[in-house]
Amino acid sequence: MKVMVIQGPNLNMLGIREQHIYGPMKLEDIHKQMKNFADANGLDIEFFQSNLEGEIVDKIQESLGDADGIIINAGAYTHTSIAIRDAIAAVQLPTIEVHLSNVYRREEFRQKSMIAPVCAGVITGFGPFSYHLAMVAMHQIFQEIEALKAQQPQQA
């Protein structure tokens, strides 16, 4: 099964920007850790990062038929983008929202997610480990989907 990892605006600046909030780890290093988990658990994984809302919407839509689940950190678009929310709802893939920082310890405007209501779950505040937790959760979702498929009567 395949996981599509979508990273939103400014996540390409991890390791440089606001290290007191996001930590020193670069996005490439987070992706390496996620790839290691995927390889160890028989999952395929693809990474995408964009600072542009429309490109993120396009990638979510392209995931339909190409991926089995999405892990997304929409960055600031989390709090503003109805378009990203609608794209997630449209593809109907299990989606996990991820944030490095605990958004509930930050500014009030960061405490409202437009996309959380259409996601399977939200993981926030564990730094880079948030992505590992998302991979564990997605792997569990995939196992549950496979178990349900195995229980379905075979079509003749």
UniProtKB/Swiss-Prot annotation:
Highest taxon listed in the record's lineage: Bacteria
GO MF assignments: 3-dehydroquinate dehydratase activity
Species in which this protein is naturally found: Nitratiruptor sp. (strain SB155-2)
Top-level EC class: lyase
Name the UniProt record assigns to this protein: 3-dehydroquinate dehydratase
This protein's UniProt keywords: Amino-acid biosynthesis, Aromatic amino acid biosynthesis, Lyase
Cited function: Catalyzes a trans-dehydration via an enolate intermediate.
Site feature location: Transition state stabilizer: R17
UniProt-annotated catalytic positions: Y22 (proton acceptor), H99 (proton donor)
Pfam family, one: DHquinase_II
Subunit structure: Homododecamer.
GO term, biological process aspect, one: aromatic amino acid family biosynthetic process
Signal peptide start-end: none
Pathway(s) of this molecule: Metabolic intermediate biosynthesis; chorismate biosynthesis; chorismate from D-erythrose 4-phosphate and phosphoenolpyruvate: step 3/7
EC number(s) given by UniProt: 4.2.1.10
Cross-referenced NCBIfam families: aroQ, PRK05395.1-2, PRK05395.1-3, PRK05395.1-4
Binding site for substrate: N73, H79, D86, L100, S101, R110
Chemical reaction(s) catalysed: 3-dehydroquinate = 3-dehydroshikimate + H2O
Family: Belongs to the type-II 3-dehydroquinase family.
